[in-house]
């Protein structure tokens, strides 16, 4: 997501100024690569959207360190939502119900959250058909969005409210926000319910003391373009939503079998076996020496008597 990039860049810059032993490195991972759990073996921390984190929390043991909180939200539990927008001149779409059979545009480089949040909004309002509306990836350039709405390639646009606020006023004034919610824990106009947002998570490779230090450090940083780090949100709702929607990415993860765990950590298992075998040999050898010395002392005492 473009909205979180300035916060990430500022955070890395601040970390590099205080971290003397190693330089923080930013590496981008695709959603597909995350399905292979070995993709995280060299990663200490992962910055991910809520739905991606939820999948990895359940199946890869990630632990939330700190969550992103926009200044417009009451808490990190209400840090993300989606605005559904239509062309003002399109009088055929005035409510979410009117989107039945329509196409919703998802800008390139947007997070997976917009699609998940829109689908859950449909479900909460009783529109449970799996094909109630379709989604289409469109250009990430806002100049092309109105053209897409005009020519009918899309009927509506799903957008992060923070991104909508940054659009030129001339663009915003030509769009209508469907069924806006403006009196809740997220004060920007939006259509869907609110959810936890982006999160910094620790992998199994990260040390416990280091993670505690990082959490305190992140929360001490100043906001960047209206975004800051806050205590970790409650992502249980995200798990419930993804399970309820039978989300393809979420359900694509599976728990590892014992065989996979052994194969993944074969070197460590072998090392543990060597250590255990050496300990057994040492114990047997030591016991034998003790028994032999005890017998020698006993025989010597008998001869003296």
Say what each PLM segment does.
Residues 1-17, 77-146, 162:
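Bilobed "Venus flytrap"/periplasmic-binding protein-like clamshell domains
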Residues 9-18, 89-90, 174-249:
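Extended ligand-binding regions for polar small-molecule ligands
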Residues 62-77, 131-134, 169-194:
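Short beta-strand->loop
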Residues 239-266:
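Short, aromatic-rich amphipathic segments at membrane interfaces
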Residues 258-294:
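Alpha-helical transmembrane signal-anchor helices
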């Amino acid at each position: 997501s473009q909205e979180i990039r300035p916060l990430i860049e500022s955070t890395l810059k601040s970390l590099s100024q205080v971290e003397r032993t190693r330089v923080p490195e930013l590496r981008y991972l695709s959603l597909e690569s995350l399905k292979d759990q070995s993709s995280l073996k060299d990663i200490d921390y992962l910055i991910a959207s809520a739905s991606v984190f939820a999948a990895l929390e359940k199946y890869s043991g990630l632990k939330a360190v700190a969550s992103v909180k926009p200044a417009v939200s009451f808490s990190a539990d209400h840090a993300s939502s989606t605005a559904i927008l239509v062309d003002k001149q399109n009088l055929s779409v005035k409510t979410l119900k009117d989107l039945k059979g329509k196409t919703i545009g998802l800008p390139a480089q947007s997070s997976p959250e917009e699609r998940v949040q829109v689908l859950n909004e449909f479900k909460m309002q009783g529109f449970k058909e799996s094909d109630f509306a379709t989604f289409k990836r469109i250009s990430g350039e806002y100049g092309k969005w109105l053209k897409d709405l005009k020519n009918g390639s899309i009927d509506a646009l799903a957008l992060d409210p923070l991104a909508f606020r940054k659009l030129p006023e001339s663009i915003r004034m030509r769009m209508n926000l469907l069924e806006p919610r403006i009196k809740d824990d997220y004060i920007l106009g939006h259509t869907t319910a609110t959810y936890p947002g982006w999160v910094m998570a620790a992998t199994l490779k990260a040390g416990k003391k280091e993670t505690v230090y990082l959490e305190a450090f992140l929360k001490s940083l100043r906001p960047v373009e209206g975004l800051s780090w806050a205590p970790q949100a409650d992502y249980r709702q995200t798990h419930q939503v993804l399970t309820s929607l039978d989300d393809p990415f979420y359900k694509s993860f599976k728990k590892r079998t014992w065989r996979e765990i052994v194969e993944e950590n074969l070197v460590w298992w072998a090392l543990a076996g060597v250590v255990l075998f050496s300990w057994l040999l040492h114990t047997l050898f030591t016991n034998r020496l003790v028994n032999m010395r005890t017998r020698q002392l006993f025989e010597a005492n008998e001869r003296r008597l």
